[in-house]
Amino acid sequence: MAVHFPFDNSYAALPEGFFARVAPTPVATPRLIKLNRPLARELGLDPDRLDSPEGAEILAGKRIPEGADPIAMAYAGHQFGNFVPQLGDGRAILLGEVIDQNGVRRDIQLKGSGPTPYSRRGDGRAALGPVLREYIVSEAMAALDIPTTRSLAAVITGETVARETLLPGAVLTRIATSHIRVGTFQFFAARRNQDAVKALADHVIARHYPNAINTKQPYLTLLQEVIRRQAELVARWLLVGFIHGVMNTDNCSVAGETIDYGPCAFMDGYDPTKVFSSIDHTGRYAYGNQPRIALWNLTRLAECLVPLISDDQDAAIADAEAALGQFSEQFGQAYHAGLRAKLGLFTAQDGDRELIGDLLGAMIEQAADFTLTFRGLSDLAGNAETDSVRNLFAEPAAFDGWLGRWRQRTAAEPQDAATRRAAMQAVNPAFIPRNHRIQAVIEAAVERDDFAPFEELLAVLAHPYRDQPGFAGYAQPPQPHEQVLQTFCGT
């Protein structure tokens, strides 16, 4: 039987200016290298039928399934602060939408499926390395319980793509609750097309924020909800040491999901100024700058929505500014609550922020590994030996004084050691997708057509909060010769 996709397409029913209808460009000999079978079932798809020659052809864009309405979405965006009035899906094509098993509408998009009217002289293709990177990191983020796009499948095309050298081509099937970005609103606002901005806002409200429909100011409620989700999302990034790397407005999802994993990376040693992206020369998107940039992006969204918020533009601007003014508090609450949880503190007390700040300061000075420090503290909560954490600090004595204060603080709460340790282990991952591990996976796949390291890394990262003694090496930071100093978009 044919592979069946229960498409229910809504974005393609919007006016033509929202997208360009374009079919994927067929590829030579598609080979399915990874299928996310649990996600397929969640989407109402049959993984056994997808895992077939016909399925590989669909997932590579060589065959169009019944009910698909392939489109490339239009959007604009600020890239490193500079406005580009037309970007759009230059190498991605939305096949359509399905309603998943939980009643949620999800996009099915092929990334690397060929040129579109928005390709801007690009070939519309993707190389295998960036496809594997996005698959690994997006699925790791999902396992960390951070809102994110998902990866359904990765397919090798049987063709090469020209980058610095000739590289194997691949297509990623990306799943999102939508691919609507701040830049999508900017596309129409820049053209002073208020009817289109309103149609887009109405679509986003119906799709993502239906509770806004019956409020007195639905477009203000929309802005407030996007701000809240972004504040909470960026807080969660910081709590696991994640650096997005390219927080342009066209990479900012109004659904509050992490999207576009090009030059992303996770920190090893804690450093708020850390930058990995090869194109971020000024540190605009450094780890510690991410909350500020999120607010900057949200301000650009507010500018698009102000004409809809109220006929009285002075009142609309005041309302939008008040909504934006909530971001810092919302981010701060989510971030500090998360840090208290990482330290096993069940209540908020005076002095907690100083305690947290002193630990982070010592971690900066001593180049302590972010992930291992907090995971190690989880073990110390269960009365483990202190050396596993002390040895992460260049001068262990810098940690000892702080440890005494932390033990005194936790002793003021009634929870026993086992309860505290379990709570801390549930929020402090042992395993993150470390850059050197991703690089090793990519090299094995690209240079040797060996996907065993890819499969093993995915299996480990699927359970980030679980001790996995047989894979303890995956928790370790890189040796000096393994360090990855820069990451690349791969476009």
Curated annotation (Swiss-Prot):
Keywords: ATP-binding, Magnesium, Manganese, Metal-binding, Nucleotide-binding, Nucleotidyltransferase, Transferase. InterPro entries: SelO. ATP binds at G88, G90, R91, K111, D123, G124, R174, R181, D260. It catalyses: L-seryl-[protein] + ATP = 3-O-(5'-adenylyl)-L-seryl-[protein] + diphosphate; L-threonyl-[protein] + ATP = 3-O-(5'-adenylyl)-L-threonyl-[protein] + diphosphate; L-tyrosyl-[protein] + ATP = O-(5'-adenylyl)-L-tyrosyl-[protein] + diphosphate; L-histidyl-[protein] + UTP = N(tele)-(5'-uridylyl)-L-histidyl-[protein] + diphosphate. Mg(2+) binds at N251, D260. Its EC number is 2.7.7.-, 2.7.7.108. The active site is at D250 (proton acceptor). It is an enzyme of class 2 (transferase). Its cofactor is Mg(2+); Mn(2+). One of its GO terms (molecular function) is AMPylase activity. HAMAP family: YdiU_SelO (MF_00692). Nucleotidyltransferase involved in the post-translational modification of proteins. It can catalyze the addition of adenosine monophosphate (AMP) or uridine monophosphate (UMP) to a protein, resulting in modifications known as AMPylation and UMPylation. Belongs to the SELO family. This is Protein nucleotidyltransferase YdiU. It comes from Rhodopseudomonas palustris (strain BisB18).
